[in-house]
């Protein structure tokens, strides 16, 4: 009996020691007089190949990423990247009835690897900056890591996870309701919050009841996006991109207009609206009997609905409904995409906003390249990004978009010139101007 008791005590002690040893290491709190370097981890389960807001954050931040980032991040001496494996292909289902099961398994897989990265593969940091969405499993795991490692949590709100999920399942689905509760419940425990628009800040205060510091950080383009004015350089760029090489000279000399639209081919971007507008534009050009400038439309990006829309494009071509309109799709490197925007005539944004308060980064990139934009404007935050008639124009229907294409791309070019000048002026607003006085100061990175 005594032996059993001693063995039990030994087993409990051994298990306790092992458990404590397995806990993530904690950040040692320095005295008020000590000035240790501020460290920040960015927790983001997104592709960093096309750097969104997270890759524009201060170069003193460490990253947890799940994809290959651009070379600028890889080469930076103050950035260390901890990669997460992508979910298995079998969890990428398009079938709605399988989605709940696949989603749960995907979250569990991400949770396992993310916890290993947050708790063991990285050192303890002063701050953990979580990009939201995705909310699951990042919010819960980041809060746990902060508790165990003496770190503090900042949530960087790009949108709401539940509003994006509602696009797939419907707003009344139990999983959407659960996600909404989860985001609201866990977000209240963060130390501070960043968000992309004033409209989003209002929602966070009124509906999420956020009481902690909440700072609006409007997106700004990275240094890769900048206007290119030299015609020889523009010609060289267009000639080097397969999708524009045959039309490069015509584009430079104004005999062809180059439209660029970046899309994720998802339900929150109604690409059929652009196709309808282009058909209307084509019909108008054909019926007028007057010479019309050809349009070369380059669509970049990958996504689940791409094949469906490509079939629609082929059908429209076969029916002769795209007279003088040539549509090509492309998957470009980050650098080529940035240069393509700088050489384009007009950008098109079909982002409709699942929440009404997020802002499309693609428009920010277009402005960074000095490219004016026409975009869907039927959501609250649109005026925070685009100054109507100065940097771009909004539309609410295919008919309106078709009219904008005719007025901006036709005539004597004065309308396009005004928008181009506005976009070039907007391109001077850069990330440091937003980050340094707000986030940089709050984090102690800028004094």
UniProtKB/Swiss-Prot annotation:
The keyword Transmembrane applies. It comes from the Eukaryota. Its EC number is 2.4.1.142. Keywords: Endoplasmic reticulum, Glycosyltransferase, Membrane, Signal-anchor, Transferase, Transmembrane, Transmembrane helix. Its main location: endoplasmic reticulum. One of its GO terms (biological process) is protein glycosylation. It catalyses: an N,N'-diacetylchitobiosyl-diphospho-di-trans,poly-cis-dolichol + GDP-alpha-D-mannose = a beta-D-Man-(1->4)-beta-D-GlcNAc-(1->4)-alpha-D-GlcNAc-diphospho-di-trans,poly-cis-dolichol + GDP + H(+). Residues 1-2 are cytoplasmic. GO terms for molecular function: chitobiosyldiphosphodolichol beta-mannosyltransferase activity. This is Chitobiosyldiphosphodolichol beta-mannosyltransferase. The lineage of its organism: Eukaryota, Fungi, Dikarya, Ascomycota, Pezizomycotina.
